[in-house]
A protein has these predicted regions:
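Membrane-spanning alpha-helical segments of multipass transporters and channels
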Residues: 48-49, 70, 91, 101, ...
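Hydrophobic alpha-helical segments typical of transmembrane helices
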Residues: 73-77, 148, 215, 295, ...
């Protein structure tokens, strides 16, 4: 077969691509850092995170009570508050400063403050206030304290309305306290828990962040092992852009195809989280998401000079990326600039799409905007990766030629010196 024929070039390109794939796959399993980020972290971290929030809600949250009113109504408020399964009136303090010291020592997670004029204002027909102070370091404890206090206050308000309503029958009192009856039926997050709300987004974000860390660390290793500190080695197998890009991308796509199915199907089932995922829908959704993450990571790998650099580039972005998706903060309240900035990352559309698939049972047709955006990102980042690797290949060849010329000049100088001797 002639070397100039098209068939020979295709076969040679496939052979080189397989060689690059084999080399990269071997490096993934031999490099401890890459192995940790690409295999161990995606396997272990979701289990730890899911186990932490497996209970969905917290019970018996310790609370400090500051009752300066010492009235019948204030005692009723405290008694009803303590009767809730979510909170516990652990300490009774004489001042707000004393309660603050308990919060500082982490003995309690919140304070209920009832002022001295609480009952007096109620008897005058004025609006009374109850202060609720919560430790915001853990959202679950904040939710338990605040919602319980709000529920008790609503119940006492209903009793005040009934006493002042002047009704003659129980039905009159019922209408006075609850003029509009409604049934609260959670449609998607049936437990109302933190795990079902946040975990789907975290799982998808883990997929992207660990991939970026693994690809970046592998790129840093390649530069450190290269004599010229280049990303691409000068070799006959690394002679074309597409064979390099496809060879490297195949490695991470194969690894994270398995990890993606594990994170989206296995982990939610293990811990009993709400999951309405069908394997056909998730397969179609993960295909563009993983590809876009792979090409995004390969494109960014040119910025990594040393193995440690990738930690600075990737790790600190995890929490901001989660916020910018709109999963833990309303998307309508995110400034337009940050919403546009979030479109750069595949995790933005990946989290939004997977949350609808997992919690709402959406099909690919229902998440068409996110699905299209992921395919657009795949195409854009693939072209960007090809351009980046083209520049890296040129730089590697240029430095290799300069090194060879310098070596030849040194050899000629040595020969001249020997001839003179």
């Amino acid at each position: 077969m002639k070397k100039s024929s098209l068939l020979y070039k295709i076969i040679n390109g496939i052979w080189d691509m397989c060689f690059i794939w084999k080399t990269e796959m071997r490096n993934v399993f031999r490099d401890e850092g890459v192995l940790i980020f690409c295999i161990l972290v995606p396997l272990g971290y979701p289990l730890l995170y899911s186990w932490i929030y497996n209970n969905e809600v917290v019970r018996e949250v310790d609370t400090a009570i500051v009752d300066l009113s010492h009235s019948h109504t204030s005692r009723e408020f405290i008694r009803d508050y303590d009767a809730s399964p979510d909170v516990k009136a652990t300490y009774y303090c004489n001042s707000l400063d004393e309660a603050k010291q308990l919060v500082q020592r982490q003995a309690v997670h919140g304070i209920i403050y009832i002022p001295a004029d609480f009952d007096t204002k109620l008897n005058r027909g004025e609006q009374a206030h109850v202060g609720v102070y919560c430790d915001m370091s853990l959202m679950l404890t904040y939710k338990a304290i605040f919602q319980t206090a709000q529920g008790v206050a609503s119940q006492i308000n209903s009793g005040i309305q009934i006493s002042k309503g002047g009704g003659f029958t129980d039905r009159d009192d019922e209408i006075t306290a609850h003029p509009l009856e409604f049934d609260e039926v959670p449609i998607f997050n049936t437990t109302g828990g933190y795990g079902n709300a946040i975990l789907p987004g975290v799982l998808v974000l883990i997929l992207q962040q660990t991939m970026l860390l693994g690809i970046g660390m592998a790129a840093g290793t390649s530069r450190e092992l290269n004599r010229n500190r280049e990303l691409i080695p000068v070799s006959e197998h690394y002679g074309g852009i597409f064979r390099i890009v496809f060879g490297k991308s195949m490695v991470y796509f194969m690894v994270y195809a398995v990890m993606g199915m594990y994170l989206t199907l296995v982990v939610p089932k293990l811990f009993g989280f709400v999951s309405m995922v069908t394997w056909t829908t998730i397969l179609g959704f993960l295909l563009p998401y993983i590809l876009s993450c792979v090409f995004f990571g390969l494109m960014l790998s040119c910025l990594v000079r040393y193995r440690e650099n990738v930690m600075l580039l990737v790790v600190f972005t995890s929490v901001p990326l989660l916020f910018m998706t709109g999963i833990s903060w309303p998307q309508s309240n995110i400034p337009a600039f940050w919403q546009g900035f979030a479109w750069v990352f595949p995790s933005t559309f990946g989290i939004r799409g997977f949350l609808r698939i997992s919690s709402m049972g959406a099909s690919l047709a229902d998440i068409l905007p996110e699905f299209r955006a992921l395919w657009i990102q795949t195409g854009v980042y693939f072209l960007a990766t090809c351009l980046v690797f083209r520049q890296q290949l040129r730089s590697a060849r240029l430095k290799a030629n300069l090194t060879a010329e310098v070596a030849e000049e040194e050899d000629e100088a040595d020969e001249l010196l020997e001839a003179k001797k």
